[in-house]
Amino acid sequence: MLVTGGTKGIGAAIAHRFAASGAQVATTARAPSASQDADLMFVAADLGTTAGVDAVVKEIENKWGGLDILINNLGATATPPGGFETLTDAFWQQVLDINLMAPVRLDRAFIPGMLERKNGVVIHIGSIAHIMPPSQSTLAYASAKGALRTYSKGLSRAVAAGGVRVNMVSPGFIETSGAHGMITEIQQNRHISEDAARQYVMNMIGGIPVGRPGRPEEVAELVAFLASDRSGYIVGVDYLLDGGTIPTV
């Protein structure tokens, strides 16, 4: 199986969850993390480019001949200052390449082999930002994740009869190492406690009814379930994992 963006945060939690269950796991990122697990296959690549995607596909095909499980976890954006009008065409394209086109290109490369074997699972990791963008500077990211959701639903119907299940998981505020760094920065800048800084972030997104951020391991558990035979009748669903942040049904 392949987990994109699998060296830290949610991706690392997913990779370690599957590896602990005995799966052969490959991860990708632009560079390995300092704590890269030696038991995981690692491919360095910039998936925001076609060349990067091609390099990963070639490496996986040479190593395993294809995939049974593809977790399109990679997602990234910047938050430039200013309003929506400051988001340039180049910025939009970069965000779309990473958050939408990388999954599209990887799916296009690996799903045909899954269809030949009549077995496969594809899970796209989205974000609740596609429902509720937290700020103007995240509009490109939110739009890309919204497009990924539409694509994921359509793709699921196209390949389900061939034995390939496609689903999506859209996390809310998950306290990864990166998110914890943001909490620490807010704590220092505002001269408040860590708990107060964490609550400040939670309030920024409209609050979390369960009273805490999510953990990467909680996302990994849902992904593991969706990749298992226990979810064999689940197709084309987008699971919001947000502690109740999104107030609508």
Stretches with model-predicted labels:
Residues 160, 165, 234-236:
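Short, small/polar-rich loop/turn modules that mediate ligand/substrate recognition or access, typified
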Residues 107-108, 153:
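A short, exposed helix-loop element centered on a Lys and neighboring polar residues
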Residues 123-147, 152-161, 173-174:
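Catalytic loop of short-chain dehydrogenase/reductase
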Residues 112, 157-158, 232:
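Alpha-helical segment proximal to the catalytic Tyr-Lys
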Residues 7-8:
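Conserved glycine-rich cofactor-binding loop
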Residues 81, 212, 223-224, 230-231, ...:
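Short C-terminal tail/terminal secondary-structure segment
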Residues 80-84, 88-96, 204:
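Substrate-binding pocket helix/loop in short-chain dehydrogenase/reductase
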